[in-house]
Every structure is written in C-alpha cells, then in structure tokens.
C-alpha cells in the first residue's frame, strides 16, 4: 500500500502552497472522521495524472487502450450495481422541508449529519484521501466558483482533472480566505489490514447529499461519475442553483453554442435538453449540405452558468473543462466532432473492448465487430447479442474527454467574461403533440414552455425507461431547491432584464422526435437541426416570418431554408402540426404538474395555462 511517489504531498500537513487555514482545518476534521491511511494534496500535474492512471492499471481499475489506436486513453468498467445517477438516494437537506420542495428528497439536516457521521466513520480506512482543488469555470472568472473535493477514489481524481480546472493554480485564486464549496466523497469500502481491494470499490448503501445553506456536498457509496465527480451535477447544478437564486444568476442544465452567419454575424444560444436527448450533438452540430457559410462553435455541452454583465445582458460560461458524454449512439455520422474529440487522452467507462485494444459501443459503426469483451468482462458476439439481447456497452456508458480537443470549440469558450446569450432553447423527447419548433411570444410564455416540458426517461437515471415524465427546464433531477421558487426566479430574471431595457433573449421550444404512423422519426435531426437554428437566428434579427397558434409562433414550410434537403410539405406538416385535442390532454397533464408544485407556484404560470386553455376552446 506504500506510494513513495506521493511522499512530497502525502501528509496531514498541507504543502506550503496551500495557505487557506479554514480549508486545512476542514481537511483535518474529515481525515479524523474517515481515517484514511494517507492524505495526498493533488497538484493537478501531468506527472500526478500519469502516476494515478498507472496505479489504477496495476489495480485493475483501468485498462490502458492500444496507444496506436487511442493514445493516452483508458477503459474503466464499473461494478454492475454502480452505473448511473441514483435519484432516489439523492437528497437536498435544507433547513426547511418546503425549501427542497416536492420534487426533491428531503431529510432534516441534523438527522442526515448523524447518518453521514456514522457512514463516514472509518470509511476511508486503508485508502488514500485525495485533496482535489478545482475551479468551475475559467480560473479567476467573475462567473466561476471554486470547490475542493476530498475523495478516496483515484478514478475520481483523474476524471476531475479532465472535467475541471484542477490543481495548484486553484489555491492561488483561493488565497488565504477565499470561498469554496466543500465536497466529501467516499466509495464506502474501507480496507482492513492485508485485505485485497477490488477493481471497482463501492457500497450497496448510497447517499448523495447536499446542504444548501452551508453549500456542502457529501457523497457515499458510489464511484460513478454523476454521484462521485462532485463538481458536476452536485455542485454545478444543485448547489450552484441555490447560489444563483441568492445572488441573482442562473445555473442551468444547458449547452452553449455560437452560431455565425455567412455574413460573419454571431449569436449565442443556450439550450436545455434532458440527459441523452441530443445535447452534445446539438452543441457540436455541423451545418448540413446546402447551408454553406454557416458555422457552429461549442462553448459547452451540458452546463451553463449565466450572470448579468455590466451592460445588463446575460453572459454564460461553461463551468466545466471536459465532456462527460453518453457513448452509445455517438458516431461519425451522428456527431463527427465528438468522435474527433475522443481520439486521445480519454477515460472511457463501461464501453466494450475490441480485440485490438480499442473501444466500441452500440451505434458507433453500422456493423459491430465479430468479437468484443463487453462492459462486464464477458465475451460478446453479434450472435450472442441476437440470442440474449445483451448490449456490449452499458446504455449509460461514458467518455471523459478534454473540451480543448473538440474541433468545434469556440474561441471564447474560456473567456472569463462569458458570452452574451441571445436565445434560450428548451426541448424534450416527444413522439407526438409538441411541434418541431415554437417561439414564445414573451418571457412568461417561454418560462411556461420550459416549466411544462416533458421527455421520456433515459438510461442516465437508474429506473424505468421509455416513460414520459415532466422535466421542467431539464432540471428536475438537478434543481437544488423548490421548483416553484425556481420558476419564480426565472420570472424575476425576465423582469430584471426588462427593467434594464436590454434586449431579452428569445425563448424557443423544440422537439426533434415526432414520429409518423410507421413509428419512425419524421425529422432527420442531427445536422439538419441547423435549419431550425437558422430560423431562430433570423427571428432574433427580425428577418424571418412565422405563423401564430395557441402556444406561440412556428415557421411555415416556406420560412425554413430547405437547400440540400428533400423534405416535403406533408412531412413538415407531420412535425409542425398542433392537434387541439392532443393539446387539451397535454394541458390537463400540465395541471397535474402544477398541482404537485402548488405551494409557491407563480400565479403568472397558472394564468398562462388558463389563457392557453381559452385559446384552444375559442
């Protein structure tokens, strides 16, 4: 268990470059509770990363991929019980239950702290506790915030180095008394003296806990990304959303992209889609044939922090430094830029291994390889798949890759001031009812659209698949406070923008997933979504027309640019039509959502629903 390579920083004593007394005392308190064998103060260097990955290869946690095929890249395969976020074990422990709201799990803070004290007592015995300093957002940005994660998982440390700005430079920004979000993580698998470790330690008991008032995160029992990489959903959305409410900004489950016209005019769009609904594909979109001169650039693919600038407009950063993307379905056809990003320096999790030491997943190629080792270490062939239905890669298999490797990365992706947002887009996976694109007539109507959006569940959350659930703003699993208060915060943001007399971002709702009578998707999606994006940009510029209906404004067939695509008026009608009977049922479902959220639900949203109902029956 001895790691002499870490001797320089393997101590309860902090290195000289850590000058933050409260941070040091906190590390000492957690160490006294969790009782690790050693403490390593991470510096974020390449040497440290190389040591950790070599250590994990030796332990069987990682497999080094063929350097000729996939340089400096690794494959991790998790325990089969630890493959996704665990929403039923995720808690918002606010002082008052009503502050967590009906969509979050709540336990009284004192009770939860007693539970965690018991779980973490000796939880890191026999293991190393890593002190991982990280910045969410460019170092020193006025939109960025700092966190420090204490974890007994080298897998977490390695992923955090890719996903955040991690290392010694964070302490320079933090100084002696800067604010940071304290994050504590353990896989919950202490080792007795002489006990052999397993390749993927975890515990059947899992807790992912947030204390909004003290801005703390505690995670126990899981080594999986969303549960263990605490800078991601836990900090960047759940805790940050509560910070944003208190401080007047937004932390959102959104991609951010730049769209530049052939004339060189650039706009920025932030878009929210539930997990595995095409967020990364949209963020890295390549304009299709016939739309020459248009260019899409990527600022972020998953999370946006949005703060008012000095001019009153909303400015966004991507708080992450990497992509933690869903692998299955990603291919050179569906997302060329993502595949190019994955050529080197990647950690893959729960994908399949090819016989020549590379990776594969469902959807990567038209034909699967003749033989693979699946994500659970078993032989896999197309014949086995046909007979058993077994997937080679887990449906929620992931890649962790540096954002800097993306060919479509925006020149401003690390601009500390952020980029100005011209439009918000919201979308879910709906096979019926919701049109291809609708523009809200005003901010309140846009907030209503986002508040009532629905999507089918995905493999990113453990549980049932294929069921439509309401997912307001794509934030249902990620909002760190009462959802009704969250809606009110969005409405208040709109009022502030109006008071500042700045151009308010337009709000659009999209649905790429309408199906025809044959059960197939009608809209081709992927790069063709550029045609919808162009209409949005032209609406911002006042150049494009549309047709008003009960729910807003949608394009007519001739309002879209069809150059290079054979898509008939009949097909367009299938994806754009508004069925009044279906929408009356939809509004009834909106009422069910509002009944769930009735405590504190803004009157403006109830009034909007009533107005829509009247329009439908007029």
Swiss-Prot record:
Reported cofactor(s): Mn(2+)
TM region positions: none
InterPro entries listed in its UniProt record: PEP_carboxykin_GTP_CS, PEP_carboxykinase_C, PEP_carboxykinase_GTP, PEP_carboxykinase_GTP_C, PEP_carboxykinase_GTP_N, PEP_carboxykinase_N
Keyword tags: Cytoplasm, Decarboxylase, Gluconeogenesis, GTP-binding, Lyase, Manganese, Metal-binding, Nucleotide-binding
Main localization, broad class: cytoplasm
The record's free-text note on cofactor binding: Binds 1 Mn(2+) ion per subunit.
Annotated substrate binding sites: 85, 224-226, 275, 396-398
Xref: SUPFAM superfamilies: PEP carboxykinase N-terminal domain (SSF68923), PEP carboxykinase-like (SSF53795)
Residues that bind Mn(2+): 233, 253, 302
Reaction it catalyzes: oxaloacetate + GTP = phosphoenolpyruvate + GDP + CO2
GO biological process, one term: gluconeogenesis
Pfam families xrefs: PEPCK_GTP (PF00821), PEPCK_N (PF17297)
An example molecular function term from Gene Ontology annotations: phosphoenolpyruvate carboxykinase (GTP) activity
Enzyme Commission number(s) of this protein: 4.1.1.32
Keyword GTP-binding on entry: yes
Recorded metabolic or biological pathway in which this protein acts: Carbohydrate biosynthesis; gluconeogenesis
Binding site for GTP: 276-281, 398, 429, 526-529
Gene Ontology CC entries for this record: cytosol
Compartments it resides in: Cytoplasm
Subunit structure as annotated in this protein's UniProt entry: Monomer.
Function as written in the Swiss-Prot or TrEMBL entry: Catalyzes the conversion of oxaloacetate (OAA) to phosphoenolpyruvate (PEP), the rate-limiting step in the metabolic pathway that produces glucose from lactate and other precursors derived from the citric acid cycle.
Family designation: Belongs to the phosphoenolpyruvate carboxykinase [GTP] family.
Protein name per UniProt: Phosphoenolpyruvate carboxykinase [GTP]
